[in-house]
Amino acid sequence: MADGEESISVAWQSVLDKLETDDRITPQLHGFLSLVEPKGIMAGTFYLEVPNEFTRGMIEQRSRVPLLNAIGTLDNTLAVTTFAIVVNPEIQQESLSTVGEPEPTPAPYLDVATFTVAPPAEITAPPRNGDTRLNSKYSFDNFVIGQSNRFAHAAAVAVAEAPAKAYNPLFIYGDSGLGKTHLLHAIGHYAMSLYPGIRVRYVSSEEFTNDFINSIANNRGSSFQARYRNIDILLIDDIQFLQRAVETQEAFFHTFNTLHDHNKQVVITSDLPPKHLTGFEDRMRSRFEWGLITDVQVPDLETRIAILRKKAQSEKIQVPDDILEFMASKISSNIRELEGTLIRVTAFASLNRTPVDMPLVQTVLKDLITLDDDNVIAPTDIITNTAEYFKLTVDDLYGSSRSQAVATARQIAMYLCRELTNLSLPKIGQLFGGRDHTTVMYANKKISELMKERRSIYNQVTELTSRIKQNHR
């Protein structure tokens, strides 16, 4: 080994200094490198320790060449030509203790399997469950992990286990229907299970906007500030809908700053990464980039099969593996439509008291699986077709009538908008006369259940789907 721990530390610091000016090392990679502990130099190899396999993989895969270049600039007397990374979980807690007050740079990754922390500071009031806005059906336990979402899931768990100490903010982006909202709710539930008394609030950007507008109209600005600033974790969904909403952005900007300055966690989702978000000021986008940015992608076939299997288990229904694979191979656009295929198949089997087999699946899904994934269905087409099918007007569906015929048609239209488009629940609610997202959730759940109980409802949904998709071929 080289002489003394001090010379090893000096050599490693020299390497880090070189990497500071290397454009190939992103802020996130600097975070991973900060977890490295230099252990010694032997036979031309710089031995380094990290707390987990994930950190080792990130450094070896994304930093190898810059790291070798930096090592090559060390004093010739050290004779270092390469490096080796060893995983030592025992340094996990020590590396955690070095993560202090949040800075406008990313915190390093913290291994979700071994890492423990003290509760977040200043949790002063017990939560009121109604204020969290969390959906009980979304948890880490029923989140299916695959290559398309593994990193995002690990980051979400780390944030829940160490609010404002792992990544702050955590920014998750990707197309609608791929699990971003699921992760937000799961973070909230898991954090609350770990830290009794922690204050969590989930909100969509539309709801945040409406709250802000109402606070101005009712002269209740202080109440608005208290609602969003006197919390420990803010989970905000679909931030892209704040585009060009200048005053609302200003309100969110100050909310973000207050939470971040007081060591509170912020988690944000969007359909695009920060640098591609239009209609936002640079100062806002830069704050989105302070922590960790990660994405969720379209799940691969194996993950889609696992999602269907998990859904079938949760519904307590038996579906053969070959059926699950067939459905997963035909529906690849998003998780929402994937689960919708299972609902239709099991509803048809329940109505006819028949087992789920391949002929049944092919019959049920013949119209669902023939549409090209790239052929986007507009929600207005769904609403127009639904109105025509039930011999109603579009205004009837948008309006406030509670007659059985109109209410059922409206709920079916909401269900189809949820299944066949990428719109969020609040966005669908806005389409239907500015209704709350919980109304859409209720409609989606009710129609899913009625399809299993009433053949008329099942037939109406099936015929409407066929008509809508026929028009888009």
Swiss-Prot record:
Places the protein is found: Cytoplasm
Disulfide bonds: none
UniProt xrefs under CDD domains: AAA (cd00009), Bac_DnaA_C (cd06571)
Keywords on record: ATP-binding, Cytoplasm, DNA replication, DNA-binding, Lipid-binding, Nucleotide-binding
Region (Domain I, interacts with DnaA modulators): 1-87
Primary localization: cytoplasm
An example Gene Ontology molecular-function term: DNA replication origin binding
Pfam families (alphabetical): Bac_DnaA, Bac_DnaA_C
Keyword Transcription: no
Ranges for region Domain III, AAA+ region: 133-349
Chain segments carrying region Domain II: 87-132
Residue positions binding ATP: G177, G179, K180, T181
Record flagged with keyword Oxidoreductase: no
An annotated GO cellular component: plasma membrane
Top-level taxon of origin: Bacteria
Similarity comment text for this entry: Belongs to the DnaA family.
Quaternary structure and partners: Oligomerizes as a right-handed, spiral filament on DNA at oriC.
Domain remarks in the Swiss-Prot or TrEMBL record: Domain I is involved in oligomerization and binding regulators, domain II is flexibile and of varying length in different bacteria, domain III forms the AAA+ region, while domain IV binds dsDNA.
Function, as annotated: Plays an essential role in the initiation and regulation of chromosomal replication. ATP-DnaA binds to the origin of replication (oriC) to initiate formation of the DNA replication initiation complex once per cell cycle. Binds the DnaA box (a 9 base pair repeat at the origin) and separates the double-stranded (ds)DNA. Forms a right-handed helical filament on oriC DNA; dsDNA binds to the exterior of the filament while single-stranded (ss)DNA is stabiized in the filament's interior.
Name of protein: Chromosomal replication initiator protein DnaA
Organism: Leifsonia xyli subsp. xyli (strain CTCB07)
Name of the encoding gene: dnaA
